[in-house]
Design a protein with these regions (language model features):
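A conserved structural/catalytic subdomain of Rossmann-like adenosyl-cofactor enzymes
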Residues: 3-179
Length: 179
């Protein structure tokens, strides 16, 4: 059951920042398949992977005009075979604006690579039909057995996103028809 409702509808937000639980194995897929809140508009994710259930809930919670989100996910949401159709539909609706690949070991007790997916319900005209992919896996410092992003790394990522253009070996703007 959604935590934020406006009467009988999902509450809508201008900005959603999320770090949902990764790849939940046990979840109520059957209930989501028949979701009365309209959160299954891309389809129903496979039983062992609830990531796209969270993704659809977040997108459904974004305000139609001003809604934006940034979601931290395991890198696997970008390429796992069993979620191909969900990804395809997500790309087709053209709300994904940016995908930032992050290096391993950035999170306590998690060695896996992660990504940040930024979506906008109203993309700038120059971004429509496009997604920028930023490979920030090399933008990680390590000290005292901890991995982290330094301010210079963060600024490089922000600059690449704001400029929305190719940067050799770091950022690539892709047409959604090529994804």
């Amino acid at each position: 059951h959604p935590a934020f409702l406006d009467g009988s509808h999902l509450r809508k937000f201008d900005i959603v920042l999320a770090n949902p639980p990764y790849s939940i194995k046990e979840w109520n897929r059957e209930k989501f398949m028949n979701d009365k809140w309209g959160r299954n508009f891309l389809g129903t994710p496979p039983q062992g992977r609830a990531d796209y259930a969270f993704f659809q809930h977040i997108i459904a919670s974004m305000d139609r005009n001003t809604g934006r989100c940034a979601i931290l996910f395991p890198h696997g949401v970008l390429f796992r075979d069993e979620e191909y159709e969900l990804r395809k539909k997500l790309v087709e609706i053209d709300i994904v604006d940016c995908v930032i690949g992050l290096g391993p070991n950035l999170f306590f007790n998690a060695s896996m690579e992660a990504c940040i997916i930024i979506c906008k319900n109203r993309k700038e005209d120059s971004h429509k039909g496009k997604v920028i992919f930023i490979d920030a896996k090399g933008e990680v410092s390590r000290k005292n057995a901890e991995s982290y992003l330094e301010n210079t790394h963060i600024q490089k990522i922000i600059s690449a996103y704001e400029n929305f253009e190719d940067i050799e070996y770091f950022a690539k703007v892709a047409d959604i028809n090529d994804i």
